[in-house]
Amino acid sequence: MKTVTVKDLVIGTGAPKIIVSLMAKDIASVKSEALAYREADFDILEWRVDHYADLSNVESVMAAAKILRETMPEKPLLFTFRSAKEGGEQAISTEAYIALNRAAIDSGLVDMIDLELFTGDDQVKETVAYAHAHDVKVVMSNHDFHKTPEAEEIIARLRKMQSFDADIPKIALMPQSTSDVLTLLAATLEMQEQYADRPIITMSMAKTGVISRLAGEVFGSAATFGAVKKASAPGQISVNDLRTVLTILHQA
């Protein structure tokens, strides 16, 4: 299986990498949050752009991205607009979503973009090609904050992302029971052992699914999300606790 290298970080080998999400409404809070995050122990900075108020002003968005890049130049920067339909803060049209991601790619400020699988097949394929032409990696994602589908469906979605040439397929699902967590873990393992030729990220959300955020190295998830301050999704634990547990499991 091939790994994915972003800056000096190799994703897909060793302990799962820690991603943290920065959620800020304006330039001033981007700046203050960035300074606070700089002291934390994590591997990838995700900027959740859907929390940013001045979205229609592309110059303002890119000015904020520049602050993040300059404050943490060594950290891979993942640009993510999470749509309202997948649990994000704002709803925008598909055209605006694609344009925003293309602007991020064009800026040269971001290392990775998050691209939602169910944006539309043609738009997804074109945006992946555009990102790769500009040396930007793509995390292709799907989120369900209500339920966990059958393992076959989870695997089918991850394989579709892989077929669309995502660098890293990602799926996050809400469990309604502990057995749903086992379904997610079993699907992750089957994907990793039988189909994946690149790193994948999977997680079961909420308190019920916390084990999935810790056991990635066992079942085949290459990264996990932790919280510096406020969790960006239910079930995230603090980066310090997360690093401790990931290290224990890695060294066991």
UniProtKB/Swiss-Prot annotation:
PROSITE patterns: DEHYDROQUINASE_I (PS01028). Inhibited by sodium borohydride. 3-dehydroquinate binds at S21, E46, W47, R48, R82, R213, S232, Q236. It is an enzyme of class 4 (lyase). Its EC number is 4.2.1.10. One of its GO terms (cellular component) is cytosol. The active site is at H143, K170. InterPro entries: 3-dehydroquinate_DH_AS (IPR018508), Aldolase_TIM (IPR013785), DHquinase_I (IPR001381), Type-I_3-dehydroquinase (IPR050146). It comes from the Bacteria. Belongs to the type-I 3-dehydroquinase family. Involved in the third step of the chorismate pathway, which leads to the biosynthesis of aromatic amino acids (AroAA). Catalyzes the cis-dehydration of 3-dehydroquinate (DHQ) and introduces the first double bond of the aromatic ring to yield 3-dehydroshikimate. The reaction involves the formation of an imine intermediate between the keto group of 3-dehydroquinate and the epsilon-amino group of a Lys-170 at the active site. This is 3-dehydroquinate dehydratase. It comes from Escherichia coli (strain K12).
